[in-house]
Amino acid sequence: MIRIAIPNKGRLHEPTIQMFKEAGLPVLGGSNRKLFAKTNDPEITFLFARAADIPEYVQDGAADVGITGLDLISETESDVEMLLDLKYGGADLVLAVPEESDISSANDLDGMRVATEFPGITARYFKDLGIKIDVVKVSGACEMTPHVGIADAIVDISSSGTTLVMNHLKVIEKVFSSSIYLIANHETAKTEEKIEHIKTALESVMHAKAKRYLMMNAPITVVDDLKEVLPGLAGPTIMKVESKEDIVAVHAVVDADIIFATITKLKAAGAFDILVMPIERMIP
């Protein structure tokens, strides 16, 4: 049995549930109020846990695989197999001070207090800079601490910076960049082939999000021109259409970020009846 630990709440919960659903491993009959949930594979089950606990759960073998933030893995210094950067949930740990503060860099904080939910990362960051600070560990509402005299600055997670601005704080330095990772227990990763299958399934979703499937018709006389526009993964697929005219159907996979320009070129080359479709999964 493979146990996958996933965040039981917070900003990572829903995107993680959705990604596994798209990968073909939906949560069955479970919710974040339960400890466990089944999947459509009898050998795989989900374990709902605090995102901060998942690195150590995986390290210690309580879970075989986990989904959590790189910031939390670094904070706990957990010894786990880093299988895959899932490219969502990106955020930065930033050093921030009150808007009216004269502090403009980490160097100005020598001998001062820095509040954070990430004391490990914060202490290592300032140690590497050769700056002595007092780390004030908090469990939430970190933004409040400079305004009530508990700290001179904070190190906090920020996705857009909106919360900091709302609380009259300004970012002076970026401490750490984080995204969401698929991790595994070292020993289990060596022996369980199904862990590689899970990784492949999630990779297929990631690859598909960046691609689009194009279908179109075109006169057979412009096929060479279309090939120049549509290299595809291994070249476009071209099929004869049963028609009174010499028409072919052309299929190709293209990068999503060039769809607009590609369609313009295809129309100019003579393609018509162009369809653009999302791809659910794409396995190399």
Curated annotation (Swiss-Prot):
<keyword id="KW-0547">Nucleotide-binding</keyword>
<keyword id="KW-0479">Metal-binding</keyword>
<dbReference type="InterPro" id="IPR018198">
    <property type="entry name" value="ATP_PRibTrfase_CS"/>
</dbReference>
<keyword id="KW-0328">Glycosyltransferase</keyword>
<comment type="pathway">
    <text>Amino-acid biosynthesis; L-histidine biosynthesis; L-histidine from 5-phospho-alpha-D-ribose 1-diphosphate: step 1/9.</text>
</comment>
<dbReference type="GO" id="GO:0005737">
    <property type="term" value="C:cytoplasm"/>
</dbReference>
<dbReference type="Pfam" id="PF01634">
    <property type="entry name" value="HisG"/>
</dbReference>
<keyword id="KW-0808">Transferase</keyword>
<dbReference type="InterPro" id="IPR001348">
    <property type="entry name" value="ATP_PRibTrfase_HisG"/>
</dbReference>
<dbReference type="GO" id="GO:0000287">
    <property type="term" value="F:magnesium ion binding"/>
</dbReference>
<dbReference type="InterPro" id="IPR013820">
    <property type="entry name" value="ATP_PRibTrfase_cat"/>
</dbReference>
<comment type="similarity">
    <text>Belongs to the ATP phosphoribosyltransferase family. Long subfamily.</text>
</comment>
<keyword id="KW-0963">Cytoplasm</keyword>
<dbReference type="InterPro" id="IPR011322">
    <property type="entry name" value="N-reg_PII-like_a/b"/>
</dbReference>
<comment type="function">
    <text>Catalyzes the condensation of ATP and 5-phosphoribose 1-diphosphate to form N'-(5'-phosphoribosyl)-ATP (PR-ATP). Has a crucial role in the pathway because the rate of histidine biosynthesis seems to be controlled primarily by regulation of HisG enzymatic activity.</text>
</comment>
<dbReference type="InterPro" id="IPR020621">
    <property type="entry name" value="ATP-PRT_HisG_long"/>
</dbReference>
<dbReference type="GO" id="GO:0003879">
    <property type="term" value="F:ATP phosphoribosyltransferase activity"/>
</dbReference>
<dbReference type="GO" id="GO:0000105">
    <property type="term" value="P:L-histidine biosynthetic process"/>
</dbReference>
<dbReference type="GO" id="GO:0005524">
    <property type="term" value="F:ATP binding"/>
</dbReference>
<keyword id="KW-0028">Amino-acid biosynthesis</keyword>
<keyword id="KW-0460">Magnesium</keyword>
<keyword id="KW-0368">Histidine biosynthesis</keyword>
<dbReference type="InterPro" id="IPR013115">
    <property type="entry name" value="HisG_C"/>
</dbReference>
<protein>
    <recommendedName>
        <fullName>ATP phosphoribosyltransferase</fullName>
        <ecNumber>2.4.2.17</ecNumber>
    </recommendedName>
</protein>
<dbReference type="Pfam" id="PF08029">
    <property type="entry name" value="HisG_C"/>
</dbReference>
<dbReference type="InterPro" id="IPR015867">
    <property type="entry name" value="N-reg_PII/ATP_PRibTrfase_C"/>
</dbReference>
<keyword id="KW-0067">ATP-binding</keyword>
